[in-house]
Every structure is written in structure tokens, then in C-alpha cells.
Amino acid sequence: MSTLNQAHCEACRADAPQVSEAELPELLKQIPDWNIEVRDGVMQLEKVFLFKNFKFALAFTNAVGEIAEAEGHHPGLLTEWGKVTVTWWSHSIKGLHRNDFIMAARTDGVASGAEGRK
């Protein structure tokens, strides 16, 4: 199990450091199925989760919402029929913070127990 999955988010201020190029490979090893996307110059973690139908996709979306609320760190969520795209990044620093990797790992934990996965 990923050590990130057991960690908690810390408060992220506008002057908090982004994940460094040196830290990036080690953190990505713990969430190997996530991709880095760059949108408008902002690095983001993204992963698509597939489900058997909309009901299961919506339940997963709500479960991710619950962990996001508990940690005070919120993703971009796109829920479609049979598919949820989850995107993590830290708005305040316009990039990736350790919190994003923690929440990606925790999202994987939610997905591992989610009903209706494809």
C-alpha cells in the first residue's frame, strides 16, 4: 500500500512550494496509473476510472467528494456515463503540491473498493 494513501493533507498557501523535479519521480512511483497533464501552464494529475454504468460512476464521484471534503482539498471531477475523470492540482500555487499526490493515492483507495468498476 502506498504511504501517500495513509498521509493527510497540510494547509497549502499561495507561497507553498510546488513539488520539485527531483521529488516528482518518487511521488509518481506511488501512483503509477496517474498521468501528468499541463493545462494553461499548470501541471495536474489526472486519471480516468471506468464503470459499468452512470449509477456506479456517480457513486464513485460522491465517494471522492467525501474524502476531498474531509481533507479540505478538492479535485476537478467530470462524471459521464460509465466514466469519471479525476484531476488533482493545487489552485493556490498553480501546480502540484504533495497534497495532490496524497489525494490521488486516496482516490485509488476509494476506487479499489468501488462497486461496478470495469
From Swiss-Prot:
Q: Which reaction does it catalyse?
A: (4aS,6R)-4a-hydroxy-L-erythro-5,6,7,8-tetrahydrobiopterin = (6R)-L-erythro-6,7-dihydrobiopterin + H2O
GO annotation, biological process = tetrahydrobiopterin biosynthetic process
Its keywords, alphabetically, are: Lyase
What domain of life is recorded for the organism?
A: Bacteria
Per its record, what are the GO molecular function terms?
4-alpha-hydroxytetrahydrobiopterin dehydratase activity
Q: Which InterPro entries match?
A: PCD_sf, Pterin-4-alpha-carb_dehyd, Pterin_deHydtase
The keyword Glycosyltransferase belongs to this UniProt entry's keyword annotation: no
- Entry-linked Pfam families: Pterin_4a
Q: What is its EC number?
A: 4.2.1.96
Similarity remark: Belongs to the pterin-4-alpha-carbinolamine dehydratase family.
Q: What is this protein called?
A: Putative pterin-4-alpha-carbinolamine dehydratase
